[in-house]
Curated annotation (Swiss-Prot):
GO CC annotations on file: cytosol; nucleus
Protein's GO biological process: charged-tRNA amino acid modification
Family statement drawn from the similarity comment of this UniProt entry: To yeast RIT1.
Name of the protein described by the UniProt record: Uncharacterized protein C3F10.06c
One annotated GO molecular function: pentosyltransferase activity
Gene source species: Schizosaccharomyces pombe (strain 972 / ATCC 24843)
Disulphide-bridged cysteine pairs: none
Domain of life: Eukaryota
Length: 453
């Protein structure tokens, strides 16, 4: 009789945990809990925290997305990001009187740092900015900072000590402070919910309520078999390792057929679904973001479909996938540190091509800027460059566009930051790396910029 090898058993669990069937069953299980939270707050707007949280909310709830990084809440690294302001949430919170923000975490943690610290820091910073600095007499006795009760007192104290500095950063970021003060008519207060919570419909009349939902149950070692399959806590995390290209959108459109598919056939099933989705004639460019009032659209290359024949448009394709449509200009630019120098190298040529168009790109019905990363970096940064050179801060076309050779005389870091904030407010997936932002600033603000325009 073979001896039991605990190391082999652990390895088997890790292998099973990476299989898409167990991941998707776990996600579907957790999504039922999220459904119950949404049902408890029927007027609140559901929000998914990219990328993990995106999987846990059924598309029938029409969620919007945000990007709060857990690393901004890591112990000793607490931060308020002026690149990820997520101010589009204020429109929703005032309309719906509250939000439900969904995320998850793996490996036995109670909740992700994004929910326990990053978002509470964001809330406290906005509250203090408006109700201590901009409108100090509106709610003079209101508590403005809230952290979860399970955080150690020393960590709470350290975070609270940094809040005034975060407010300073926000006020110096170039955002429209008058608009911020007008939107936030009362302070925001977070409420934390996990599968271990007693579910209620609690909210706060004196505050806008933001319900922070951890979708997955906390289980020892991150795995459990109590539901008849290998339950993976935070199963949606690291989707590159298990999804085989499946997206949350395709999953929720085909949930039943995916979850009932035999395990050994699931990868083929996913491949067929992705192929049929790409070839669907009913798709439109609704998945791209329109940077109103300009004609610029940004988004993922998979979300582009040729507009009607009578539409005057131009496509700036920064992906490796050629769309083979008319008026397409291809400049593949990868994401991350490797993409930043490529972006800097290609932009003068892109600008030269744009300036040679007849009619000009800004007189067309649409200019589509697409990449392979949901316009998180490359497409958003290219849109940022175009806005800085051709538009004012109200997104209206300049009478005389700024040439790249003269941009350092007309633009400042604050101006660039203000345009970035406007893009982020419209396209919440915008989250350029430091390397890409340095490339943008180098092109626009450096006296050594190559003059090609």
């Amino acid at each position: 009789m073979d001896e039991f090898d605990p190391l082999d058993a652990v390895q088997q669990i890790h292998v099973q945990a990476r299989h898409p069937k167990n991941r998707l069953l776990s996600i579907a299980h957790d999504a039922k809990f999220v459904d119950s939270v949404i049902a408890s707050y029927p007027t609140f707007k559901p929000v998914v925290n990219e990328r993990c949280g995106t999987w846990y909310v059924n598309r029938r709830h029409a969620p919007i997305s945000v990007y709060f990084k857990s690393t901004d809440g890591h112990t000793g690294q607490w931060s308020f990001s002026c690149r990820r302001l997520n101010l589009h949430l204020l429109n929703e919170i005032t309309t719906c009187d509250g939000l439900i923000i969904v995320d998850s975490t793996r490996r036995g943690k109670r909740m992700p740092d994004a929910l326990s610290k990053t978002i509470p820091i964001w809330i406290a910073t906005l509250n203090k900015c408006v109700f201590e600095r901009l409108r100090p007499h509106s709610f003079p006795n209101a508590r403005l900072a809230f952290l979860p009760p399970f955080l150690p007192d020393t960590e709470k104290s350290s975070i609270l000590q940094r809040l005034d500095g975060f407010v300073d950063s926000l006020m110096q970021s170039g955002i429209d402070l008058d608009a911020l003060a007008a939107k936030l008519t009362k302070p925001i207060r977070p409420l934390w919910v996990t599968p271990a919570s007693r579910l209620t419909s609690a909210q706060f009349e004196e505050y806008f309520t933001v319900v922070l939902v951890t979708a997955s149950a906390q289980v020892q070692n991150g795995y459990s078999r109590e539901h008849g399959f290998l339950y993976v806590q935070g199963a949606a995390d690291d989707e590159e390792e298990w999804s085989h290209g499946l997206t949350p959108e395709v999953f929720w459109q085909n949930t039943e057929s995916i979850l009932t598919c035999p395990e050994e056939q699931l990868e083929q099933k996913i491949s067929l679904l992705l192929s049929s989705t790409r070839n669907s004639p009913t798709m439109s460019n609704s998945s791209l973001t329109h940077l109103l009032p300009t004609p610029i659209f940004v988004g993922d290359v998979t979300g582009f479909y040729p507009p009607p024949e009578n539409t005057s448009y131009f496509v700036l394709n920064l992906s490796n996938t050629t769309l083979n449509v008319k008026n397409e200009l291809c400049f593949p630019i990868p994401s991350g540190k490797k993409g930043a120098p490529v972006f800097r190298k290609h932009f003068p040529s892109i600008l030269q091509e744009l300036n040679s168009l007849d009619p000009p790109f800004y007189e067309r019905d649409a200019i589509f800027i697409v990449d392979e990363g949901n316009a998180k970096e490359a497409a958003s940064c290219l849109a940022l460059m175009i806005l800085c050179l051709y538009y004012d801060l109200h997104m209206h076309l300049l009478a005389h566009p700024i040439s790249l050779s003269a941009s350092q005389s007309h633009l400042t870091k604050q101006t660039v930051r203000q345009f970035l904030v406007k893009i982020t407010e419209l396209h919440s997936k915008t989250n350029p790396s430091r390397a890409f932002l340095l490339a943008v600033n180098s092109l626009l603000l450096s006296a050594n910029t190559i003059a090609t325009s």
